[in-house]
Amino acid sequence: MMKKIDVKILDPRVGEQFPLPTYATSGSAGLDLRACLDESVELTPGATTLLPTGLAIHIADPSLAAVILPRSGLGHKHGVVLGNLVGLIDSDYQGQLMVSVWNRGQQSFTIEPGERIAQMVFVPVVQAEFNLVEDFTATDRGEGGFGHSGRK
């Protein structure tokens, strides 16, 4: 059964002046989020800013969450990434989706109204249950970490 998620449009320009979020291809996992701005924003090297998306979300189902991820082209070509690296949207959050952007590049970057700035992916959630134990059942790896399995 397909799950439905309530995404509210807060800014009347979404769907009119700015396209609704869509999946770019049939295999796309992420929906593009756009900067709902009245005017361009210049992001100088090293600067961060919060950008509104014009969308609010309430996932409601605790077995789901959303993550906001950078768009690969912005980071690779321009050095513009998410200020918090990944945004996590819990199922009980009900506010506007804001995107923190950070210019880690060497040049100023201008964000235009309606520009695609990030992508949102819905993911399943598994919550951990903690149990106090004395030890674990032994495995071949044991406590080996940080390069334990080698490079080749």
Curated annotation (Swiss-Prot):
E.C. numbers: 3.6.1.23
Catalytic activity field: dUTP + H2O = dUMP + diphosphate + H(+)
Keyword Secreted: no
Gene Ontology biological-process entries: dUMP biosynthetic process; dUTP catabolic process
Cysteines joined through disulfide linkages: none
UniProt key word Repeat: no
Domain of life: Bacteria
Pathway the protein contributes to: Pyrimidine metabolism; dUMP biosynthesis; dUMP from dCTP (dUTP route): step 2/2
Protein family (similarity comment): Belongs to the dUTPase family.
HAMAP family hit by this protein: dUTPase_bact
Role, per record: This enzyme is involved in nucleotide metabolism: it produces dUMP, the immediate precursor of thymidine nucleotides and it decreases the intracellular concentration of dUTP so that uracil cannot be incorporated into DNA.
Protein name: Deoxyuridine 5'-triphosphate nucleotidohydrolase
Lineage start: Bacteria, Pseudomonadati, Pseudomonadota, Gammaproteobacteria, Enterobacterales
